[in-house]
Amino acid sequence: MIREHLLKEIEKKRAELLQIVMANGMTSHITIELSQELDHLLIQYQKQRLRAVAGDE
């Protein structure tokens, strides 16, 4: 996934997660699912950054 697109997806998922937390609470099933999806996106982003840094050296 292109870095800029990934950042947009992360921001979109964060906003969605915030709305779900406010509506359903921190421990609801949907909140946990969305949080895990956000975690996955963040891990993808970190891997891309690490590859970019390693490639620059």
UniProtKB/Swiss-Prot annotation:
It is an enzyme of class 3 (hydrolase). The keyword Hydrolase applies. It comes from the Bacteria. GO terms for molecular function: hydrolase activity; protein dimerization activity. Keywords: Hydrolase, Sporulation. It holds the Pfam family SpoOE-like. GO terms for biological process: regulation of sporulation; sporulation resulting in formation of a cellular spore. Induction: During exponential phase and in conditions antithetical to sporulation. Its EC number is 3.1.3.-. Belongs to the spo0E family. Aspartyl-phosphate phosphatase which specifically dephosphorylates the sporulation transcription factor Spo0A-P and negatively regulates the sporulation initiation pathway in order to control the proper timing of sporulation. This is Aspartyl-phosphate phosphatase YnzD. It comes from Bacillus subtilis (strain 168). The gene is ynzD.
